[in-house]
Amino acid sequence: MTAPTTRKDLMIVNMGPQHPSMHGVLRLIVTLDGEDVVDCEPILGYLHRGMEKIAENRTIIQYLPYVTRWDYLATMFTEAITINGPEQLGNIQVPKRASYIRVIMLELSRIASHLLWLGPFMADIGAQTPFFYIFRERELIYDLFEAATGMRMMHNYFRIGGVAADLPYGWIDKCLDFCDYFLTGVAEYQKLITRNPIFLERVEGVGIIGGDEALNWGLSGPMLRASGIEWDLRKVDHYESYDEFDWQVQWQREGDSLARYLVRIGEMTESIKIIQQALEGIPGGPYENLEIRRFDRLKDPEWNDFEYRFISKKPSPTFELSKQELYVRVEAPKGELGIFLIGDQSVFPWRWKIRPPGFINLQILPQLVKRMKLADIMTILGSIDIIMGEVDR
């Protein structure tokens, strides 16, 4: 009897676009040699909605509801970047109270985003319990958002020159109570997860990125800081009122999935410190500035000769973007979220280029998963933290 002949072929597997661990509509074409990954090709574009083109025929206020659909888990950051550009073009001074309110909202949004990263990341590698715990704290943040903005998600709260409404009565006390409660929650997560031997087996030494490699790929956010690069735009660019608070940049040297987890856990604690300081030191005064003070270059102005305009807040404003270009950026939960804005002396931007952190961080995925096991793809992709809304735009 002749023995059956065996063939050793590579196998091609489709992961996604409807797989639960793909975090949206990402499709990976994975080439396998047994359990080992030989090649991985991400296929993007399933959630492309033409966000950059839509911006070119909308005023800034009309465009604000659209931007919350990029990274729909950290909508305050997309709103912040959308109004920061026109503010810098128009030389609009933001009142101190409005700046403090913005910082509070941004840091609450950062915590909510990191929480909804942590739960699915743990579920991807087999730990179901934290997935239910994180919704408990995240629900409290959404209650705070709803009280201040009227919306739990897609808040539409930031405005050119300030915010849409002041903080309601009793909101500050409620937020301080949340901060005290949340610190005990983070301690609970660390006790449950950080020293868990099964968790450490799955993430330690998996998906290592060196510091030089991270810089060469243009990575940002926790991906960059977990590779030993101490770079945070809140410290570098000095935007809003971050310089007035005492906090530390969270970073690790190892560059693996565990380091990225530790950076994000540390960032949640630092965000609570920033929120507590902002709530205790929030000044009085207006929450918006509807006045533009800008040089009128056509009149050959003399020193201190400014053109004054008033922005109407409720309807679409007649606020013109002056004829210049500008790149603005903020430190979003996933990395550097930037806008390259070109004005054309019109109420519509001539060009609105989005620099999404998730799209650029995702580029390194094929390199990270090569020569790893199939099961490690979930760990590595989860540690990158992507949202397909901002990847595809």
UniProtKB/Swiss-Prot annotation:
Q: Which GO terms describe its molecular function?
A: NAD binding; oxidoreductase activity, acting on NAD(P)H, quinone or similar compound as acceptor; quinone binding
Membrane-protein topology = Peripheral membrane protein
As for subcellular location, the record says: Plastid, Chloroplast thylakoid membrane
Q: What is its EC number?
A: 7.1.1.-
Q: What class of enzyme is it?
A: translocase
The answer to keyword Cell inner membrane applying to this record is no
Name one matching Pfam family.
Complex1_49kDa
Q: Which keywords does UniProt give here?
A: Chloroplast, Membrane, NAD, NADP, Plastid, Plastoquinone, Quinone, Thylakoid, Translocase, Transport
What does the entry list under GO cellular component? chloroplast thylakoid membrane
Q: Which GO terms describe its biological process?
A: photosynthesis, light reaction
Query: InterPro entries, alphabetically?
Result: NADH_Q_OxRdtase_suD, NADH_UbQ_OxRdtase_49kDa_CS, NDH1_su_D/H, NiFe-Hase_large
Q: Which Gene3D superfamilies does its entry note?
A: Cytochrome-c3 Hydrogenase, chain B (1.10.645.10)
Q: Does the keyword Translocase apply?
A: yes
Q: What S-S linkages are listed for this chain?
A: none
What broad class describes the main subcellular location of this protein? Answer: plastid
**Catalytic function, reaction form:** a plastoquinone + NADH + (n+1) H(+)(in) = a plastoquinol + NAD(+) + n H(+)(out); a plastoquinone + NADPH + (n+1) H(+)(in) = a plastoquinol + NADP(+) + n H(+)(out)
Q: How does it assemble?
A: NDH is composed of at least 16 different subunits, 5 of which are encoded in the nucleus.
Per the entry, what this protein does is:
NDH shuttles electrons from NAD(P)H:plastoquinone, via FMN and iron-sulfur (Fe-S) centers, to quinones in the photosynthetic chain and possibly in a chloroplast respiratory chain. The immediate electron acceptor for the enzyme in this species is believed to be plastoquinone. Couples the redox reaction to proton translocation, and thus conserves the redox energy in a proton gradient.
Regarding protein family, the annotation reads:
Belongs to the complex I 49 kDa subunit family.
Task: Report what the protein is called.
Answer: NAD(P)H-quinone oxidoreductase subunit H, chloroplastic
Native source species: Nicotiana tabacum
Q: What is the lineage of its organism?
A: Eukaryota, Viridiplantae, Streptophyta, Embryophyta, Tracheophyta
